[in-house]
């Protein structure tokens, strides 16, 4: 308890001497305040303007980048639309070309088929005429030789020699029914 009474006694002496009042500021406070204001002025004058300049440049750069991105996106949209339009036009054109090629191919096939049918028809007509000529020639030959052939056949069957004139008369009698 002796220490507490000594400190109360020391404080009462300081108050009695009129020295250290905590409500009245001392010189240290003013000195620290002056240093703070000087440092604040130096920082505000030499440090803040370059930092603000860099920040403004970055803001401008970010704004320019955003504008460039928007412009690039718009250009991309326009290019995409042009591409889609060109592709649609190309598809329509390709479809038209394909349809034309199919129609032309069908026409070529039909023309070839018609030509082949015409050739077949002409070949058949030629063959028919040739067969008719050969048939007529064979018929004439057979008519010319029928008498001698029938006489020869009758001779072989009957075993008797038959004359061609008799064979002709007997052949006309049997066929004349």
From Swiss-Prot:
<keyword id="KW-0138">CF(0)</keyword>
<comment type="similarity">
    <text>Belongs to the ATPase B chain family.</text>
</comment>
<keyword id="KW-1133">Transmembrane helix</keyword>
<dbReference type="InterPro" id="IPR002146">
    <property type="entry name" value="ATP_synth_b/b'su_bac/chlpt"/>
</dbReference>
<keyword id="KW-0066">ATP synthesis</keyword>
<comment type="function">
    <text>Component of the F(0) channel, it forms part of the peripheral stalk, linking F(1) to F(0).</text>
</comment>
<dbReference type="GO" id="GO:0005886">
    <property type="term" value="C:plasma membrane"/>
</dbReference>
<dbReference type="Pfam" id="PF00430">
    <property type="entry name" value="ATP-synt_B"/>
</dbReference>
<dbReference type="InterPro" id="IPR028987">
    <property type="entry name" value="ATP_synth_B-like_membr_sf"/>
</dbReference>
<comment type="subunit">
    <text>F-type ATPases have 2 components, F(1) - the catalytic core - and F(0) - the membrane proton channel. F(1) has five subunits: alpha(3), beta(3), gamma(1), delta(1), epsilon(1). F(0) has three main subunits: a(1), b(2) and c(10-14). The alpha and beta chains form an alternating ring which encloses part of the gamma chain. F(1) is attached to F(0) by a central stalk formed by the gamma and epsilon chains, while a peripheral stalk is formed by the delta and b chains.</text>
</comment>
<protein>
    <recommendedName>
        <fullName>ATP synthase subunit b</fullName>
    </recommendedName>
</protein>
<feature type="transmembrane region" description="Helical">
    <location>
        <begin position="29"/>
        <end position="49"/>
    </location>
</feature>
<keyword id="KW-0812">Transmembrane</keyword>
<keyword id="KW-0472">Membrane</keyword>
<keyword id="KW-0406">Ion transport</keyword>
<dbReference type="GO" id="GO:0045259">
    <property type="term" value="C:proton-transporting ATP synthase complex"/>
</dbReference>
<dbReference type="GO" id="GO:0046933">
    <property type="term" value="F:proton-transporting ATP synthase activity, rotational mechanism"/>
</dbReference>
<keyword id="KW-0813">Transport</keyword>
<dbReference type="InterPro" id="IPR050059">
    <property type="entry name" value="ATP_synthase_B_chain"/>
</dbReference>
<keyword id="KW-1003">Cell membrane</keyword>
<dbReference type="GO" id="GO:0046961">
    <property type="term" value="F:proton-transporting ATPase activity, rotational mechanism"/>
</dbReference>
<comment type="function">
    <text>F(1)F(0) ATP synthase produces ATP from ADP in the presence of a proton or sodium gradient. F-type ATPases consist of two structural domains, F(1) containing the extramembraneous catalytic core and F(0) containing the membrane proton channel, linked together by a central stalk and a peripheral stalk. During catalysis, ATP synthesis in the catalytic domain of F(1) is coupled via a rotary mechanism of the central stalk subunits to proton translocation.</text>
</comment>
<keyword id="KW-0375">Hydrogen ion transport</keyword>
